[in-house]
Curated annotation (Swiss-Prot):
Belongs to the short-chain dehydrogenases/reductases (SDR) family. Substrate binds at G177. It comes from the Eukaryota. This is Retinol dehydrogenase 14. The modification Phosphothreonine is found at T5. In the retina detected in the cone and rod photoreceptor outer segments, weak expression in Mueller cells.
Amino acid sequence: MAVGTAAALLAALGGILWLAARRFVGSSVQRLHQGRDSGLMRGKTVLITGANSGLGRATAAELLRLGARVIMGCRDRERAEEAAGQLRREVCPAGGPDSGPNSGGAGELVVKELDLASLSSVRSFCQEMLQEEPRLDVLINNAGVFQCPYMKTEDGFEMQFGVNHLGHFLLTNLLLGLLKSSAPSRIVVVSSKLYKYGDINFEDLNSEQSYNKSFCYSRSKLANILFTRELARRLEGTSVTVNVLHPGIVRTNLGRHIHIPLLVRPLFNLVSWAFFKTPEEGAQTAVYLASSPEVEGVSGRYFGDCKEEELLPKAMDESVARKLWDISEVMVGILK
């Protein structure tokens, strides 16, 4: 029995390693824009929420390479400044300071404090943006909370719905004027394939009656898509586009609230190494939607791996999208 078990484990391990080898030989990281496009985003200002780690950090690095002025909107200023310093050393020549938007090299990094779990923080951040920034070419709603235990935001909202949907809903609405005055401009929303397992229960949006952390995450990601589609409808004719994406399964710290048994962790780590995307790979669709001429004027669409994908009918329900918008306006205080 022991010999058989060992043989099975070795076979499974061999299979994983073989698949991993195929994956890395066939799909090493391919940056969307090579040297000839290194200045594609020069002169443009991009705001990325949650840019100090994971997908957000990788997205910031790619856009910095393309010459953008990148504003990192992050909850923890100290961690964000540390990440910004690392990015400057990685991307900017000779580890020096930012080259600046007009230097012909890498772009510029700016750190601003933004806590999406606090509507007052969102308002203060937007006020600072409107006072200090003359333009905003791209807004990337990237920050997120993933399957956390039940907790509430500063304003009393279930954390995942509050941060992933409501915080970004208010942020986007307060910055729309700046985006319109900077047009043509773009909004990029990071959702997830897990939206498929969510539903919008208008009777219990705050999960007061029951809480399932997986379902609530999926619901918040479905809300991201419905928000995108309704916003695209409202922005028709403004030269401001908005699209939504799923990054795939990515190796980030987003899953820090998920408990993996100690004995299973080595296998999980091996599987994630073999099959999950790196943050750099996962960031490519966001970079594509933020910068590529191929999607100029495209709005209200859902993308994965830099290609448009189909949505389930529940993610295209216009009546649900409008109702969610109306309720969200009240929840964040845009309408009383």
